[in-house]
Amino acid sequence: MSRAAICLLLAAAPAVPYAAILGYMTPPQPLTEARIASEAGAERAAWQAYLDRSRTLLEADKATLAAERAGGPYPDAAPHKGGAGGMPSNRPAAWYGTPEARHVADNILSFQTPAGGWGKNVDRTGPVRQRGQHYVSFDGGRESWNFVGTIDNNATITELRFLARVQAQLPGTEGQVYRAAFARGVRYLLNAQYPNGGFPQIYPLQGGYHDAITYNDDAFSNVVQLLREVAARQGDYAFVPEALAGESRAAAEKAIRVILATQIVAGGVRTGWCQQHDALTLAAVGARNFEPIALASNESARLLQLLMQLPDPSAEVVAAVDAGAAWLKRTALPVGNWARFYDVQTMQPVFGDRDRSIHDTIDEISEERRKGYGWFVTGPEKALKTYASWAAKRL
C-alpha cells in the first residue's frame, strides 16, 4: 500500500478522543480525636464533645439491641425495600388517619433507634419490628451496623414527614405517640449536626467517608428543608413546641452558613459544590471508590434551589446563587444535560471506577460502573429555570 493510500485511510478513520487515567481517589479521613486536636483550633472542645456524644449514642444503640437478643434466638432482619419504603407523601390528608397509614406509622415507631434516627431501605408497610430484630434491612448483611441511623436515601427525613402527616389526623391523645417519636427524630438531627453546621451521612458516626459533610443525593438539602419547615410550625408541623422549633431554626441557619463556606472557588471564581466536604476543614473529599473529588452538578443544583427558597437572601447568598448558576450554565453539555462530576481545575467531566481510578472519558471505566451509576444528569435544568425567575425578581 502506498504512502498516499495510508494517509487517506487514516484521514477517513473516526477520531478517537484522548483518554487517560487522571489519578486515583484518596479515601477521606474520618473524624477522630487526633484530627480534632490538630485541626479544630478554638472549636476543639465543641468538636470533642460532639465526638464523645456520638460514641455514647452508638454504644447505647448497640447495647440495646444486644440486651434484646440475650438468652435466645432473634428474628431475621426486615427485607430490603428501596424508594420511598412504603411511606407515600402525596395521598389526600384524610388517608393518613386510616388503619393502613397508621400501620406504616407504627412500623416507623418500632424501628426508631434509641438515638432517635432510622436506617434506610426498610419496607415500612411490613410487620412492626420484633424484639431483637435489627434496625436495618439485610441490605448490609445480617449483622452489619451500616446505616443504623442515616440521612442517606432520604432515610429519617421520610419517616419524620410521614409521622407528621399521621399525627395531624390524630390531634387527640392517640396521636401523641407519633408526636413524641417525631420530636425524638428531630432531636436526632440536631444531635447529628456538626459544630460548624454540617451533617454526616450516618449518625452516630461510623467512620470512613460517612463522616464527611454529605451533599450527595441531596441528603444535606433534605435535612435543612425539613428543619426550616419544623421551625415555621405550619401545617403538619404546627404541633412542634416553640423551643424545638427555635432549635431547628438555628440549626437550619447554621447549615446555610456551611453551604456558603463550602462553595468551591476555582481560579478566583465561585462555582458549585462537591458531593462531600471534610467535616473539619470543609475541603472537598471523595466518597466511595468511584466518587472522586469533583464538582457535582446535581447536588450543586439542589443546593442552589435551597438557597433560592430563603426569604430576604443576604448579599452573600445572592452572590453564591449567581455564581453557582453561572457555573451550571458554563458546564452544560452540548446535548443539553450535565456530567455528574467535573474536575475542579479543568472543569471537564470526570468518571471514577471501583479501583479508585479517575478517567476523562466514560468509555475507559469498567462496564459495571458505566451501566451501574448515573454519570449524566438533568437536575440542573430545573434549578436554572428557577434561577431565571428568582433573578428577575431582583432586577
PLM features: residue spans?
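Bacterial N-terminal signal peptides
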Residues: 5-15
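Terminal, non-catalytic domain-edge segments
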Residues: 20-98, 229, 233-254, 280-287, ...
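Intrinsic, low-complexity N-terminal interaction/targeting segments
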Residues: 62-65, 69-71, 118, 123-125, ...
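N-terminal carbohydrate-binding/catalytic regions of secreted carbohydrate-active enzymes
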Residues: 86-157
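Aromatic- and histidine-enriched alpha-helix N-cap/loop-to-helix transition segments
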Residues: 96-100, 150-161, 214-225, 247, ...
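Long, well-ordered core segments of solenoidal/helical folds
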Residues: 104-117, 181-198, 249-268, 320-336
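Alpha-solenoid helical repeat scaffolds
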Residues: 111-114, 169-172, 195, 233-236, ...
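Eukaryote-skewed repeat-based solenoidal scaffolds used as protein-protein interaction platforms
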Residues: 167, 175, 179-190, 203, ...
